[in-house]
Every structure is written in structure tokens, then in C-alpha cells.
Amino acid sequence: MGRRKKMVERVTTLMNEPEKIRNIGIVAHIDHGKTTLSDNLLAGAGMISKELAGRQLFMDSDEEEQERGITIDASNVSMVHTYNNEDYLINLIDTPGHVDFGGDVTRAMRAVDGAVVVVDAVEGTMPQTETVLRQALREHVRPVLFVNKVDRLINELQVDSQEMQVRLGKVIDHVNKLIKNMNPEKFKAGWKVDAAAGTVAFGSALYNWAISVPMMQKTGISFTNVYDYCKAEDMKALAEKCPLHATVLDMVIRFLPNPLEAQKGRVPTIWHGDANSEIGKSMASANADGDLAFMVTDISIDPHAGEVATGRLFSGSFSRGMEVYISGTARKSRVQQVGIFMGPERLEVEKIPAGNIAAVTGLKDAIVGSTVTTLDGMTPFESIRHVSEPVVTVAVEAKHTKDLPKLVEVLRQVAKEDPTLQITLDEETGEHLMAGMGELHLEVIAHRIQRDKNVEITTSKPIVVYRETIKKKIEPVEGKSPNRHNRFYIYVEPLDTAIVEMIKSGDISMNLPELERRQKLIELGMGKEEAKGIVGIHNSNIFIDITKGIQYLNETMELILDGFEEVMRAGPLTREPVANMKCVLVDAKLHEDAIHRGPAQVIPAARQAIQAGMLMAEDCLLEPYQKVFVQVPQLTMGGATKELQGRRGIILNMTTEGDLAIIEARVPVAEMFGFAGEIRSATEGRAMWSTEFGGFDIVPTSIQTEVVGQIRERKGLKRDLPKASDYLSM
């Protein structure tokens, strides 16, 4: 215990010296060695025993993580490293590499300033490497590179010293190419990784050694020596001469920014308030004496302390008992405890100043993405934008009726802990629906509900999440209120792809100042009148009012938008969410007496005009796709391509590297169930594969009627397709 206590003392001292702090994340493709690297860094810092490092998976503290051998949540830990005889505080977040848990990576990137990108020397950069690098650059998080599993190049692939250096050079070039393509400005500003400069390290996380150019200069060890040690399988000696933690953490301290340097550049990216205001200046300078500005990036449940909100403190200081505002809520909250994480343990401290990652209890109203502040009316931080969308749903029921109230509360909690999970109640069937990033994501959540929350549940077979959209523009449709006194004339048309992308990325939203939003839309080709008339955005759909001088319309607009949002949540074809559509109100006739234009009159009138309009505009289904990357020996390539094409997959690219074939395909999620078993048998168990979200596309006409019929039947609707007249005659 003495060692741990001493560590806490060192951590709490360094917390107050921002230039000595590094907030970093470790990111990579699944199985490239992030968690093993994290454990060895902790061992080097004296947090866990060196014998267990790489095998203990301290960061994978959850049973499910150890069992499946993957990281599911992002884990936090604070530790101390000595560089040039000075102590530094490193707040480290280990993130998942599996595509189903990408939401954790996105949120972790908001909390950190730098990232160690881990790439397997044998596999090279993979789809998730690209995804996590893109997320880091988007959040203004600076990368350095660690090329892992160098020993495998030498001992398994039997490459010589020269070939090893060529292969490592290729990995570096590929990472730089990605950075350059994703963000040319940052690349020009020196954000590339460069072995000669020292921003790249090579090694083996499993065998606890790493080398970099500065480390070579310090120890006299060359690439040839590294090759000889690996060939002789004497990696223990190599680990003594070039310990992994020293090489990697030296690189982190030397090349990744401290909060004072980082926040100057990061704050304008993640906060769009007035940079010259007191709070703007305070965040840019990580001022511990300014108003509090804290961004929640994770919510976890502690059995004793309740909800723990973890996040990045950009300004001010947290201490017990202080009162704070939480964005989106009216009342104040009182902070109960403040602390830091040491892996699974949360340690209480008296005070945490700006520039640190803090864990706080007492913020019951906070959700992931909340802004916590002492300043009433502060502009909140930009919302966290996730790269993928939920594509698979299961229905969840309590096994025993007595557990139903508990299940409702538990689902509320898991949705808070994991914002990439969508929980909805199907009003018609009474089922709770849980939508997630993939089968594995939902399996893990279901298992945790039973294990951690003690609620026995049954789940349905996974169902694909579809979207509805339209194919063409139509003339305005009249929607009448039930009392016939109010009429709305609305037309619908597909929304331009460039605008859809800007809405999805958060660059266009109702939170933007109106003039700024209007300007962006005009630049994207929208007419001035329409850009000025936007009154509502729901998911990737917009509602525009271009009417002129209609009496009582202002006080009715909220109800019209309620009708619009109802249809956007459940379209007329299959009651699935609507995407990529523009609704335009061109005229309205309203009763002068408010009693005759209440919710029961206005909402159905607006709703029916949009529903009928969508059916006239060729309402159709969009289905989610996954990009699938398969690595197989060339001999079994035929089996792999046949398997992908048999699932309505389109082969996008095929390359060869040595005797390996790399296939890139795009396959509908509906066809991916059971893929793991089938691809193994098609390739004699020799395929390695991974997936990433591949967007939505229109369901082929040949199967559309069948798919629509199945969805309608499942939801208890008539199998026959609805007609526009079904809505207009109501």
C-alpha cells in the first residue's frame, strides 16, 4: 500500500503544474496491442508488477474484457514518469479497437491532447487505425506512432534486417499519407510522424522493449542489434537495455503538448463561444483560478457512490461541495467527491485544477457531452460526434414481470453510460428496443445488464435498423386538421448530400448563430430564402418555412414542428426513422381562435401532409452497410470473395502483399449475420477480418417490397403498402 500512497502524493503534487501534465490516449485497430502497451507503461511507472505486465491486462479490468480478450470501455489511469530528472504526470486513456465500441474512442479523444497510435508491424495500418486517426485529428489531438510486434516480423516472417527497415518505413509512410489526406493544414504545420525526429518508436509490447532514434543515441543500440537480439530470442536483455515504458513515455513527454500548449489550439475546435470572453480566455490558458468549464466524456456507475462523471477540466478547479450548472438543466448540482482514476480504482483528492482529467460524483443530471460550469449561461461545448450510427436492434424484456420497473431504470442507466446505445419504447408493442453498433456491442450490454444490474432478461434476435427516404420532389400537399379549420401546404424533396454531411458532422445545427448557419447553407448551394427559413433540424432532415405574413403562424410553429418530428421518427412506409429529407411549408390557413388550432388539430394536419407527400415522392428504404476488410492467403481468396458476393457484397478493392490477399468489400448489415463462422469455413479458418460502418444505401428494388412487408408485419402493421390517399382522406 505504501507504494500506491506515495504514487498518489506525487500525482496530486504534479496536478498543479500544467506544464508537467500530458493527457494522452492510446488508439489502434483491434488486437494491435494497445492494452498490452498500456500495462507495460503502468509497470514501468510502478503501478503493477513487471512480471504481470502484458499478461495482467490491468486496463481491461472488466470480466467480459478479460474473457473476450478485447477492450470494451475506455479505461483511465494517472501515473508519474521521470524524464531528464523531472517528474511528469501522465493521464492515460486506453481505448477499444473493435468497431462496435468506437463510441468510447470518440469520447476519449475529447478528454486528451495527444494520442499514441499503435500499429502492428506485420498487419500495417488497418481500417480502425484510419478511423481513430481521423477522430484524433478532428478533435485537434496530436499523434505519435508506436509500431508494435516488430519481433513477429523477424521471427515469424523471417525478414532480414534490411527488409525489416523497409517494412517499418512503409508503415510510417502510410500513417503520414493518412494524416496528409485527412488534414493537409496540420500535416504542413508539422503534425507528421518522423522516426529521425523521434516521434516514432518501434518495439514489442508483449516482450516489453522499444527503440526510437533518441533512445538509440542514448543507449548505442542500433536496428542491427535489435534484429540480432530478436533472432537470438533474447528479448529480456533487450528489454533491460531499452525498456518500453522509458522509450514511449519519453516520446510522449517530449513531443505531445501539455494542457497550456494544447488548449490554445483545441478550445476553438471544440467550443464555439466568444474567444475574447473571460471564460474563453480562461480555457485557452488552462487557468485554474477562472470559472469552472468541464466536459463530461464518460459516465460510469459506482455501486457505493452512484454515478461518476469523468471528463476534461478546461478551466477552473473542482473541489468538494461546490455548486455547478449542467448544460440543458435548470437546477444547480452540488459536487460530492472529486477524484482521479487508477485503472478500476477511483481515488479521492481534495481539489483538481484545470488541465486534468477528473472523476466527479454528485452530477446526477449530467450525461456524456454535458458542459459543467460555475458560469450561468455559458455557451456549451460542441456535442461529441460519433463516427458510426446504430445499425442493429434487439428487443429486451424482463424474464420476470416483477423486474419490469427495475429493467426500465437499468436501461436508463446503460443509455447514460453509453451514448452510442439508443433505447426506445415501442408504444404499440410495449417492448424496449436497444439499438447499437453491432451484434457484439448488444451482446456485451445484455450480458452486463444481467451480471452487474442483476436483472434477468430475454433478448430477441438482432434486427437491422433501416431508414426511410424519398427519391424525388413533389408539388405541395394539403394537410387538413380534423376540424377542417386549419390547412397546411407542404412539399418534400431529397436533401442535398453536402448539406446532409454537414448536419451529421455537427457543422450545421440549430445551435449555430442564424447568420452563420444561413451563410454555410448558401455556400452549399441552398437558395437565400430557404436558408433564411430553416425552423427545425431533426437528424438529417430539415423543415423550412417560406410563407409570408401568415397570421398566428409563429405561435403555431412549435406544433407544426412536433408533427414534422413525429414523422421523422417513424416514416409512413415502415415506421422507421426518416433520413436526408427537406420539408418546405409554402402556405397555411389558420383559424383565428386559438382554441380551434391546438395540438389535436395542428399536429395531425402537418403530420398527414408530410406522410402523404413522402409516399408521393417515392418513399423507399435505406439499409446500413459495413465495409469489410478480409486478409487471406491467396490460395483461399476465391472462397472469401465468393462468400462476400453471396451476401450481396460488392468487392471494392483487392491487393496482394507477399502471399496474402487483402479484399475490401461493402456488404449490407442484413447479410452479415453468421459471417464469422462462414468466412472461417470458406477459407479453412485462415481469414482475418474486420469491419467498419459503411453508411446507408437504397435497398435494391428487387427485394424492397419483401423487406418492407416483413418490417410492417413485425411491427403489427398491415403487410400491404400504404398509399398517399390513406393519409389525405383522414
UniProtKB/Swiss-Prot annotation:
GTP binds at residues 28-35, 94-98, 148-151. Gene3D superfamilies: 3.30.230.10, 3.30.70.240, Elongation Factor G (Translational Gtpase), domain 3 (3.30.70.870), P-loop containing nucleotide triphosphate hydrolases (3.40.50.300), Translation factors (2.40.30.10). It is found in: Cytoplasm. Residues 19-260 form the tr-type G domain. Its main location: cytoplasm. GO terms for molecular function: GTP binding; GTPase activity; translation elongation factor activity. The modification Diphthamide is found at residue 596. InterPro entries: EFG_II, EFG_III/V, EFG_V-like, EFTu-like_2, G_TR_CS, P-loop_NTPase, Ribosomal_Su5_D2-typ_SF, Ribsml_uS5_D2-typ_fold_subgr. Keywords: Cytoplasm, Elongation factor, GTP-binding, Nucleotide-binding, Protein biosynthesis. CDD domains: aeEF2_snRNP_like_IV (cd01681), EF2_II (cd16268), EF2_snRNP_III (cd16261), Elongation_Factor_C (cd01514). GO terms for cellular component: cytosol; ribonucleoprotein complex. Signal peptide: none annotated. Belongs to the TRAFAC class translation factor GTPase superfamily. Classic translation factor GTPase family. EF-G/EF-2 subfamily. Catalyzes the GTP-dependent ribosomal translocation step during translation elongation. During this step, the ribosome changes from the pre-translocational (PRE) to the post-translocational (POST) state as the newly formed A-site-bound peptidyl-tRNA and P-site-bound deacylated tRNA move to the P and E sites, respectively. Catalyzes the coordinated movement of the two tRNA molecules, the mRNA and conformational changes in the ribosome. This is Elongation factor 2. It comes from Methanosarcina thermophila. The lineage of its organism: Archaea, Methanobacteriati, Methanobacteriota, Stenosarchaea group, Methanomicrobia.
